[in-house]
């Protein structure tokens, strides 16, 4: 009986449990399975008291706390994964950076590492960044999949050419800022300064342009001589270095001592062939300095050739381009007439240039002052004119006779100047006789006065015919009228004894003053005349 009751209770529980599975709770949609149409079985909750199971109000709070717990566990797992991944990442990158730092230490150790004496060392290195290197670095920094080997190769090729830091190279430089060498700027400014000095001081006015042009050509020729010698020496040195490089395989052969078999072979080679001895060429290159290959005569010949041909080359090149461009637009039938016209034009230009050479002599430099014309009505008075150009730079004659104005002359200057001019005129006559040359320039009135002394003119009514036979009566010194001393007699003025008394008596006469001016201009009476202009004036006034 008891067994039957127990069996009935079990069956009732089983049927009740089956009915519970088919029942759908509308408030518990989380456990509802839409595919089977039944409610899911709730899991057994451990650690939950019976009071909580019984209380339906706390079901949502329990589910929320369960979700938070699950979220915390997932976050913890993610952190653990990140840590593990970071450890793996660092384990792969550490060897790369170790090798990179090791390379830096090896390169700097060659130059010297800091020690107790030198606490700081400054090095310079070059960085070469390729595209593949840049991609590997970007992958590493962004956390993408990167390869340690590729990154290691990229870092090892970045830093090269380690050297000590040169503080001078980092200073400010003139050529880097302006793009011009300071030496060239200095030379240009020096040339400009020379030109400004010439213009400001007017030195070019004292030297003729033709002389300046000759000097410029001469200086240019001297500079070109040294220039071409240095150029030829550089060429010879470069050729010598190239020949030495070609003869390098013969260093060991020609340096060794030759035995009997080698000498026999060399004799046969020189006897039966026309080839030069390579060792002779080798020792010539070894012993002969290239400086001996460029003598001054060679530099002189090259300089003279370039001095003549180089300008003609440029002229010919320009003329060829001009003719080519001109003939390109002209028909073929007109080529010959155009060439003939051009040849005639060139010949005309050369002829005109040759005719104008004489005009170039008058360009530049001060000209000599033209002699003044003779004054009408009286003899030209000898004026104190500077007949030499002012002293200048090199070529001009030196100025030694200053101009003296009448205000600055003293009472005895007229007599002194007249005597000096007479002496100069005597020297001119002697130069004509002996043929000597002098830098002194003869003026037209010098020749006229010399002819006047040789052929004196007789003034009618003022000169007595008997005066020539009585020279001593007028106060002349005896013996001065001999033919052998005619030049000396003509150079010294007559000294009449009674001239002073006569001049005192007729001081206010205009004719006397005019005669005195003529005496000052002529420097003395004419040769062969015994009466002075003053005495003649006395007769006229008297």
UniProtKB/Swiss-Prot annotation:
The chain crosses the membrane at residues 185-205, 217-237, 330-350. Residues 480-491 have a biased composition (Low complexity). GO terms for molecular function: chloride channel activity. The keyword Signal applies. Disulfide bonds: none annotated. It is a multi-pass membrane protein. Keywords: Chloride, Chloride channel, Endoplasmic reticulum, Ion channel, Ion transport, Membrane, Phosphoprotein, Signal, Transmembrane, Transmembrane helix, Transport. Residues 19-184, 238-329 are lumenal. Residues 377-389 have a biased composition (Basic and acidic residues). GO terms for biological process: endoplasmic reticulum calcium ion homeostasis. Residues 206-216, 351-542 are cytoplasmic. Residues 369-394, 452-542 are annotated as: Disordered. The modification Phosphothreonine is found at residue 482. The modification Phosphoserine is found at residues 438, 464, 532. It is found in: Endoplasmic reticulum membrane. The record marks 25, 181 as: Ca(2+)-mediated inhibition of channel activity. It catalyses: chloride(in) = chloride(out); bromide(in) = bromide(out); nitrate(in) = nitrate(out); fluoride(in) = fluoride(out). Pfam families: MCLC. Its main location: endoplasmic reticulum. Belongs to the chloride channel MCLC family. Homomultimers. Interacts with mitochondrial protein PIGBOS1 (via C-terminus); the interaction occurs at the mitochondria-associated endoplasmic reticulum (ER) membrane, a zone of contact between the ER and mitochondrial membranes, but does not appear to play a role in ER-mitochondria tethering and is not affected by ER stress. Interacts with CALR. This is Chloride channel CLIC-like protein 1. It comes from Bos taurus (Bovine). The gene is CLCC1.
């Amino acid at each position: 009986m008891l067994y039957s009751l127990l069996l009935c209770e079990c069956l009732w529980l089983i049927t009740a449990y089956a009915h519970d599975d088919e029942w759908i709770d509308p408030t518990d949609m989380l456990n509802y399975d839409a595919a089977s149409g039944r409610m899911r079985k709730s899991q057994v909750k451990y650690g939950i008291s019976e009071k909580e199971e019984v209380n339906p109000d706390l079901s949502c709070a329990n589910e929320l706390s369960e979700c938070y717990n699950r979220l915390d566990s997932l976050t913890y797992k993610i952190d653990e994964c990140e840590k593990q991944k970071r450890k793996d990442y660092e384990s792969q990158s550490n060897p790369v950076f170790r090798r990179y730092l090791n390379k830096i230490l090896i390169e700097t150790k060659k130059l010297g590492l800091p020690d107790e004496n030198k606490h700081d060392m400054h090095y310079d290195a070059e960085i070469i960044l390729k595209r593949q290197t840049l991609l590997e670095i970007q992958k590493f920094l962004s956390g993408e999949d990167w390869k340690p080997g590729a990154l290691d190769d990229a870092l090892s090729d970045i830093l090269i050419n380690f050297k000590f830091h040169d503080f001078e190279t980092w200073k400010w430089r003139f050529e880097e800022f302006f793009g011009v060498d300071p030496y060239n700027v200095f030379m240009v400014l020096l040339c400009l300064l020379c030109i400004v000095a010439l213009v400001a001081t007017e030195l070019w006015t004292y030297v003729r342009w033709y002389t300046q042009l000759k000097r410029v050509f001469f200086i240019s020729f001297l500079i070109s001589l040294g220039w071409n010698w240095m150029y030829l020496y550089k060429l010879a040195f470069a050729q010598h270095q190239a020949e030495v490089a070609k003869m390098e395989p013969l260093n060991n052969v020609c340096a060794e001592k030759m035995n009997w078999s080698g000498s026999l072979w060399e004799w046969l080679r020189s006897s039966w062939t026309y080839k030069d001895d390579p060792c002779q060429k080798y020792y010539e290159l070894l012993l002969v300095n290239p400086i001996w290959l460029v003598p001054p005569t060679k530099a002189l010949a090259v300089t003279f050739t370039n001095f003549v041909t180089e300008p003609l080359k440029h002229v010919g090149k320009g003329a060829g381009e001009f003719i080519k461009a001109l003939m390109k637009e002209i028909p073929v039938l007109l080529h010959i007439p155009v060439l003939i016209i051009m040849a005639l034009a060139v010949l005309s230009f050369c002829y005109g240039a040759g005719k104008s050479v004489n005009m170039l002599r008058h360009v530049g430099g001060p000209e000599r002052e033209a002699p003044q014309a003779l004054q009408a009505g009286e003899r030209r008075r000898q004026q104190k004119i500077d007949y030499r150009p002012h002293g200048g730079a090199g070529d001009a004659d030196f100025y030694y006779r200053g101009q003296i104005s009448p205000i600055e002359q003293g009472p005895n200057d007229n007599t002194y100047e007249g005597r000096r001019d007479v002496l100069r005129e005597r020297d001119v006559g002697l130069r004509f006789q002996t043929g000597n040359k002098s830098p002194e320039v003869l003026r037209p009135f010098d020749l006229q006065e010399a002819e006047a002394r040789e052929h004196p003119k007789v003034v009618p009514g003022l000169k007595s015919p008997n005066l020539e036979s009585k020279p001593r009566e007028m106060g002349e010194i005896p013996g001065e009228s001999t033919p052998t001393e005619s030049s000396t007699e003509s150079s010294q003025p007559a000294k009449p004894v009674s001239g002073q008394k006569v001049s005192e008596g007729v001081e206010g006469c205009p004719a006397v003053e005019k005669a005195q001016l003529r005496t000052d201009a002529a420097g003395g009476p004419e040769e062969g005349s015994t009466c002075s202009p003053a005495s003649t004036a006395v007769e006229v006034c008297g």
